[in-house]
């Protein structure tokens, strides 16, 4: 890049940044932060611990978001000063530094742009993510456990808290189904596009003849709702079963019948929890998960989408897949909605799915169905 090209590139970035700032509205963030600071200064603020923690968490999140915006804004403006210096006197070292900074700023703007796409009412909530084995037998169960690890790694890398609340292992290998609660700002907004069927093609380690197998796993993602949202549940509509926990292992796996499974008879929705030590605690957590699912179902009905909570009620097979993961004869992960693909399977399975998330959110914002 020559100096003129660098300046042109900066002008493009500056225009993009100015447009994005109109969406991000840093001045509104400052207003809300001030309001929250005023609340937190009240001597009685910590009388309601739960509410105080929610406000503190919101304040920290907004503060970090505003700091990100102000930092990028400062970098964009400072860069013009360096470009002006380059125009006056060419300096290869400064030139290289400016070129590097331009690329970094572009990445930061893209990340903030992605966050601006999360504007739905429930996007800011925690996510309840369930993986369930479909067609493919033990191979599908192994694939389901691989997906469980992928989402766990993704969440951990983002600094989110991950809680495994239900785990139903297969008799041979892998997992029949498992549920995670992923806690952190906009967890649901980022993960909502992962809902659907994920297809794996590979040479199965469970096949002595080393044949290529196709297997499927379904992913369901719903937002965790606030406790103050009222969802009416009639006790007579519930079937509650208890069973012995079958966790992924470790010293804290329950040895008594403390795990709880709740079936909502009118809708057929089933939730389960085994992460707590007592049956009562598991029942409370399972009930909250059921409320979240019923609330989501009601939202879907209001939008007149002819779907059930877990997405369209198709078989977990070919027709309903959203993403294909091919391990052999070549390596490719491809999103069938957006067309985004990558050959770096190892990175994807280690939780590097941000590019898929970003492409989905942009596709959806443009009216993708």
From Swiss-Prot:
GO cellular component, one term: cytoplasm
Family matches, as PANTHER family: CLASS I PEPTIDE CHAIN RELEASE FACTOR, PEPTIDE CHAIN RELEASE FACTOR 2
Keyword Hydrolase tagged: no
Compartments (UniProt record): Cytoplasm
InterPro entries: PCRF, Pep_chain_release_fac_I, Pep_chain_release_fac_I_sf, PrfB
Residue intervals passing through the bilayer: none
Family: Belongs to the prokaryotic/mitochondrial release factor family.
UniProt keyword annotation of Glycoprotein present: no
PTM annotation (N5-methylglutamine): residues: 251
Role noted for this protein: Peptide chain release factor 2 directs the termination of translation in response to the peptide chain termination codons UGA and UAA.
Keyword set, alphabetical order: Cytoplasm, Methylation, Protein biosynthesis
Protein's name according to its UniProt entry: Peptide chain release factor 2
Main location: cytoplasm
Domain of life: Bacteria
UniProt GO MF annotations: translation release factor activity, codon specific
PTM per Swiss-Prot/TrEMBL: Methylated by PrmC. Methylation increases the termination efficiency of RF2.
């Amino acid at each position: 890049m020559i100096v003129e090209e660098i300046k042109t590139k900066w002008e493009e970035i500056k225009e993009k940044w100015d447009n994005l700032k109109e969406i991000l509205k840093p001045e509104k963030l400052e207003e809300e932060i001030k309001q929250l600071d005023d609340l937190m200064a009240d001597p009685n603020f910590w009388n309601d611990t739960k509410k105080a923690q929610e406000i503190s968490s919101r304040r920290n999140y907004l503060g970090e978001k505003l700091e990100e915006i102000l930092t990028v804004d400062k970098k964009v403006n400072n860069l013009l000063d360096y470009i002006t210096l380059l125009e006056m006197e060419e300096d290869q070292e400064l030139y290289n530094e400016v070129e590097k900074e331009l690329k970094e700023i572009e990445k930061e703007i893209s990340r903030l742009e992605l966050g601006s796409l999360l504007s739905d009412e429930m996007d800011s909530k925690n996510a309840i993510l369930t993986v369930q084995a479909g067609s493919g037998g033990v191979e599908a169960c192994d694939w389901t456990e691989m997906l469980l690890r992928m989402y766990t790694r993704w969440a951990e890398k983002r600094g989110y808290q991950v809680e495994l609340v239900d785990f139903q292992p297969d008799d041979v290998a892998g997992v029949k189904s498992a549920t995670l609660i992923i806690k952190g700002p906009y967890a649901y907004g980022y993960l909502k596009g992962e809902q659907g069927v994920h297809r794996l093609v590979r040479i199965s380690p469970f096949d002595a003849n080393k044949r290529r197998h196709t297997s499927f796993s379904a992913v369901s993602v719903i937002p965790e709702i606030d406790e103050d949202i009222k969802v009416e549940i009639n006790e007579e509509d519930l079937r509650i079963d208890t069973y012995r926990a079958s966790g992924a292992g470790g010293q804290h796996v329950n040895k008594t019948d403390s795990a709880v499974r709740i079936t909502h008879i009118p809708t057929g929705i089933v939730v389960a929890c085994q992460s707590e030590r007592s049956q009562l605690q598991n029942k409370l957590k399972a009930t909250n998960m059921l409320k979240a699912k019923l609330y989501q179902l009601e939202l879907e009905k209001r939008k007149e989408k002819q779907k059930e909570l877990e997405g369209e009620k198709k078989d977990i097979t070919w027709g309903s897949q959203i993403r294909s993961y091919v391990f052999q004869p070549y390596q490719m992960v491809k999103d069938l909605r957006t067309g985004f693909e990558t050959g770096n399977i190892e990175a994807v399975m280690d939780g590097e799915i941000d590019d898929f998330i970003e492409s989905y959110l942009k596709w959806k914002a443009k009216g993708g169905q």
